[in-house]
Amino acid sequence: EMKYIASWSGGKDSTASIILAHEHHEPLDLIIFSEVMFDKGISGELPEHIDFIQNKAIPIFESWGYKTKILRSDKTYMDCFYHVVQKSEKNKGKRQGFPRPNMCKINDRCKTEVLERFHKGLKTGEYQKYIGIAKDEPARLSRIKTSDDSQISLLQKYGYTNQKSAE
C-alpha cells in the first residue's frame, strides 16, 4: 500500500504544502521534520522556530488526523564543531571548528543524512514524498523531476508561487 509522506522544514513552502494536502483531501500518512540539535539536550533550531513546530503546527496537524514524527541525527552541531579532520592533508588532525561559509557540513550531517536514512528504510515505489517547492522555482523543480519520481510538489500542482505560499 502506497504511503504519502510530507517532508516538512517548518518553513512557509513546506507548511503550505501540508495545508494544501488538507484542503484538497490529498492522502497524507506522515509528516516528518528533521531537527538539528546543538548538543544531545539542546535544539539547534531557533527558539521561535522550534516553538512554532512543537507547540503550534504539530498540534494543528494532529488535530487534522495527521501523524507527525521529529527525526534527529546521532550527530549534533557540537559533534561537527569538535570533529577532527581526517581526509584533508592540509588540515588533517585539526578540529573542524566553526562552519565556514559555503562549506558548512552541519545541514548535511545533522539534517539531510537522517532524512535520507529514513527514506532508505522505505521501499521504492511504496511511498510518495510531498516537498515544498513553489511553481516559480524552475531550477529546484527540474532537479526533483530528474532525481526522484517519488517526489511531488503540491505547490506546483495547485499553482502556488513563493509569494502565494507566504500568504
Task: Describe the role of every protein-language-model region.
Residues 1-167:
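Nucleotide-activated chemistry modules centered on ATP-dependent adenylation/adenylyltransferase
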